[in-house]
């Protein structure tokens, strides 16, 4: 779409300024629900063998990627047919929702602030909100390492990759991978 770059700039600007629009259901939750539903169905369809599980997994990836691209592409097509401004606003909305820059910054700064205040229990709690491991017994160094590691990983997964795919293929590609 001709407006994709402008929508990316506006949407990413909104992400930097405002963070995720919490008043909306996030597309990643929709995709997660789709995965759970399809996985349940595919476990009934494919045999419970290593090859059956592999085939079901491949089928799941293909279906989710197709739906993740196809549904947004169709919705954008329809929105642009109704009116170009509606299509542009939908593109902006998705370009706002997909990256997680401000959210990542805000959550990581909570860890930094607690460490700065010498509040190790608070820092452990703050880092537990962004990592997938037990933080109860982490030292100050452990909290710092966990925060840096997750910031690096999530910068790749939640900022750089989404921006790359949004730039390459607009919101439809950004939502599909």
What are these regions (language model features)?
Residues 1-176:
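Hydrophobic alpha-helical transmembrane segments
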């Amino acid at each position: 779409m001709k407006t994709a770059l402008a929508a990316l700039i506006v949407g990413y600007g909104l992400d930097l300024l405002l963070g995720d629009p919490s008043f909306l259901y996030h597309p990643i939750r929709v995709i997660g629900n789709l995965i759970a539903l399809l996985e349940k169905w595919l476990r009934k369809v494919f045999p419970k063998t290593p090859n059956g599980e592999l085939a079901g997994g491949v089928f799941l990836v293909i279906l989710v990627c197709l739906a993740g691209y196809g549904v947004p592409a169709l919705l954008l097509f329809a929105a642009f047919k109704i009116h170009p401004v509606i299509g542009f606003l939908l593109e902006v909305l998705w370009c706002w929702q997909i990256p997680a820059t401000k959210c990542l910054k805000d959550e990581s700064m909570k860890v930094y602030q607690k460490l700065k205040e010498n509040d190790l229990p608070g820092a452990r709690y703050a880092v537990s909100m962004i990592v997938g491991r037990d933080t109860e017994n982490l030292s100050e160094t452990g909290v710092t390492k966990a925060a840096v590691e997750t910031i690096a990983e999530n910068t790749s997964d939640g900022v750089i990759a989404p921006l790359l795919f949004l730039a390459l293929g607009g919101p439809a590609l950004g939502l599909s991978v």
